[in-house]
Amino acid sequence: MAQTLQMEIPNFGNSILECLNEQRLQGLYCDVSVVVKGHAFKAHRAVLAASSSYFRDLFNNSRSAVVELPAAVQPQSFQQILSFCYTGRLSMNVGDQFLLMYTAGFLQIQEIMEKGTEFFLKVSSPSCDSQGLHAEEAPSSEPQSPVAQTSGWPACSTPLPLVSRVKTEQQESDSVQCMPVAKRLWDSGQKEAGGGGNGSRKMAKFSTPDLAANRPHQPPPPQQAPVVAAAQPAVAAGAGQPAGGVAAAGGVVSGPSTSERTSPGTSSAYTSDSPGSYHNEEDEEEDGGEEGMDEQYRQICNMYTMYSMMNVGQTAEKVEALPEQVAPESRNRIRVRQDLASLPAELINQIGNRCHPKLYDEGDPSEKLELVTGTNVYITRAQLMNCHVSAGTRHKVLLRRLLASFFDRNTLANSCGTGIRSSTNDPRRKPLDSRVLHAVKYYCQNFAPNFKESEMNAIAADMCTNARRVVRKSWMPKVKVLKAEDDAYTTFISETGKIEPDMMGVEHGFETASHEGEAGPSAEALQ
């Protein structure tokens, strides 16, 4: 038998991508230009299509050398994501990660959405330790300089190992300071929403006044993040565990990492806080890590929602749900539901404290409630209760009911859904209002921890498709009537056309007969 020789070059694919990145930075062999708010970025179609489902679908439908992205995409975020498509590395300022996640979700880059969420949870966690991040779990935050990369071909070599990148990250004083910004939004939202009970006690555990009262003898240096750095030692000391040391230069707390014990999407603060639940202080201290991760997940979702809507620039305008228009046969049943002052007790036993906080108290059914605090998206108490009574514990049904409360049939029929998973290839159809979509998504995330944004994309696209079918069916009787009238008119015209030749034939025969009658006697006379 013939022998087979095999040769393998490690990291050859990475080297090719690095060289392609060098070509991109130098403007060599690029076959597409992506325009973002007037800024043109040259790239290779093959690399963009391999990294992003959005570009893959876009290039399948268009061969244009210039592609323009919507106004919701920011040039800085797209530049970082474009660099990620070539290098697999992300470099961003603290506080920009939420805008980056929004852009990655719009461009449908699953790697950033999956790994980035886990990485940002670790960074935002009070128990975060930069040395505990592994290569397979988190992307690097190493800053890269385009000037250094364009110096020549040697830049295509293997990048620095993760250990050196982590050490560089430790030397930055603001590497874990993204939590206070999200926390201020979260705390202010909870105060405005009137949230109380055990949930407020959990969130107060990580607030700045409580931490200052617990540790007055150890004020943190100005370069450190006081909220993030002091939270985990306080919890660890209360549980009888040694607190981690503080790095002098980086302000990063090293302590027992609890990020591996829980998943950010498997628990909910509302789920654990039933009306009759009781938590003693010892259990709360032991479960401090899990509660902290749960709260961090809520903060990231809230910050992601708020940052996305801030980019649209339309948060100042108030959005309200549509007035209810029900069929006569179901009007009595709906009226009984609208007369409810609060949610039924049996429904509360099933879903717990996962609904809007004002639904648990009696109130006017016509009262307008803000679906999510700070979004300016309002819905009446009766409509929201009808959504919950119809959905029960099924979050997908709740999502459909909420979308139907804000968008009528014609709006859905003339839309392409969320824009991420389009229900039509017609470029004239625009996505639904992003403010309503963000508010509904965040409300469903509070209701069901396992809610996925892809579910909303699919359901919205399905609702738009069904709305177009219903609108098309409603036009069918009118089209049939017009077609019947057109057929009758055509039949009348055809019959009229048949009558006219017959009349012409009769006249022609009469004239011929008269001529023959006149010619007959003259011929006989000649004879």
From Swiss-Prot:
Location relative to the cell: Nucleus; Cytoplasm
- Molecular function terms from GO: DNA-binding transcription factor activity, RNA polymerase II-specific; DNA-binding transcription repressor activity, RNA polymerase II-specific; histone deacetylase binding; RNA polymerase II cis-regulatory region sequence-specific DNA binding
Q: Give the residue ranges for region: Disordered.
A: 131-153, 210-292
Q: Tell me yes or no: is Phosphoprotein among this UniProt entry's keywords.
A: yes
One Pfam family name is BTB
Instruction: Give the modified residues of type Phosphoserine.
Output: 188, 259
Q: Which organism is it from?
A: Homo sapiens
What protein is this chain from?
A: Nucleus accumbens-associated protein 1
Q: Where is the composition biased (Acidic residues)?
A: 281-292
Q: What does this protein do?
A: Functions as a transcriptional repressor. Seems to function as a transcriptional corepressor in neuronal cells through recruitment of HDAC3 and HDAC4. Contributes to tumor progression, and tumor cell proliferation and survival. This may be mediated at least in part through repressing transcriptional activity of GADD45GIP1. Required for recruiting the proteasome from the nucleus to the cytoplasm and dendritic spines.
From which domain of life does this come? Eukaryota
Looking at the UniProt record for this protein, which Gene Ontology cellular component terms does it annotate, in alphabetical order? cell junction; cytoplasm; intracellular membrane-bounded organelle; nucleoplasm; nucleus
Bias (Polar residues) occurs at 141-152, 255-277
Q: Which part of the chain is the BTB domain?
A: 30-94
Subunit description: Homooligomer; mediated by the BTB domain. Interacts with HDAC3 and HDAC4. Interacts (via BTB domain) with CUL3, PSMD7 and RCOR1.
Q: Give the gene that encodes this protein.
A: NACC1
| Keywords linked to the UniProt accession | Cytoplasm, Disease variant, Epilepsy, Intellectual disability, Isopeptide bond, Nucleus, Phosphoprotein, Repressor, Transcription, Transcription regulation, Ubl conjugation
Output the CDD domains linked to this UniProt entry.
BTB_POZ_BTBD14B_NAC1 (cd18290)
Traced from the root, the source organism's taxonomic lineage reads: Eukaryota, Metazoa, Chordata, Craniata, Vertebrata
GO annotation, biological process: negative regulation of DNA-templated transcription; positive regulation of cell population proliferation; regulation of transcription by RNA polymerase II
Q: Which InterPro entries match?
A: BEN_domain (IPR018379), BTB/POZ_dom (IPR000210), SKP1/BTB/POZ_sf (IPR011333), ZnFinger_BTB_dom_contain (IPR050457)
